[in-house]
């Protein structure tokens, strides 16, 4: 069984886009873990493109983390899907049926990819948390120097910790796993540290739920930008500098978050969704 795929790079976020429109076969845990363990195919997320189940959508996407768990959102992965669709002549503007609802995206004139990530959710009663939270702008959770987080859902849950010094000096590989698995988060959580560099920019590092330390996380960049604006630290339209590069985030007055940035192709080929075996297309 051959499934076309492209290995892509969304600012260092390693993404596999798999064209599963002609298949009813699900990706098996065996296949996902085999691909994740392969040095060349190792990924942060797999974005599986399927035919839509809703009339208002052009395509349906499933999202898988490297540990085999399902994800509800992946901003950089969605940008890679939009790029793949435009490069395969499906159009320029798309409505994608994602786990969190309909997501709109398009290719810009400058070849950057923009995605409307929808509206953030600050209501703790609608978040998978284990205790009552009165104010999601300031939650009582601590790990080492990290404290006083802002909790936001961008379809998936994010905790943003603001620090005064550069984000590279904090060992997120040490504190990230502890916070991801904190009892407050029964379904785990994405953990980011942010440092404000100006009213128009911030630096961000992320420990991603189910993927670990990543070069970039699009939904975390959105959460970081919104959290900074909520605390009156930045403007609505800012650059978020990640280890893998820069994303432009615009938190519009209608509450929608627009994320824009580049993507790169690495290689394409065919994979077996049952086993994870794959072959590059050298044509």
From Swiss-Prot:
Subcellular locations according to the entry: Cytoplasm
GO CC annotation terms, alphabetical: cytosol
Pathway the protein acts in: Amino-acid biosynthesis; L-lysine biosynthesis via DAP pathway; DL-2,6-diaminopimelate from LL-2,6-diaminopimelate: step 1/1
Primary location class: cytoplasm
Enzyme Commission code: 5.1.1.7
Family matches, as Gene3D superfamilies: Diaminopimelate Epimerase, Chain A, domain 1
PANTHER family reported for this sequence: DIAMINOPIMELATE EPIMERASE (PTHR31689:SF0), DIAMINOPIMELATE EPIMERASE, CHLOROPLASTIC (PTHR31689)
Reported function: Catalyzes the stereoinversion of LL-2,6-diaminopimelate (L,L-DAP) to meso-diaminopimelate (meso-DAP), a precursor of L-lysine and an essential component of the bacterial peptidoglycan.
Reaction catalyzed: (2S,6S)-2,6-diaminopimelate = meso-2,6-diaminopimelate
Alphabetized GO MF terms: diaminopimelate epimerase activity
Keyword field contains RNA-binding: no
Assembly mode: Homodimer.
Active site: 74 (proton donor), 217 (proton acceptor)
Stretch forming the signal peptide: none
Protein name, entry field: Diaminopimelate epimerase
Residues noted as binding substrate in the record, renumbered to the chain: 13, 45, 65, 75-76, 156, 190, 208-209, 218-219
GO biological process, one term: lysine biosynthetic process via diaminopimelate
Cross-referenced Pfam families: DAP_epimerase
Family affiliation: Belongs to the diaminopimelate epimerase family.
Keywords: Amino-acid biosynthesis, Cytoplasm, Isomerase, Lysine biosynthesis
Site label Could be important to modulate the pK values of the two catalytic cysteine residues, positions: 158, 208
Organism: Bartonella tribocorum (strain CIP 105476 / IBS 506)
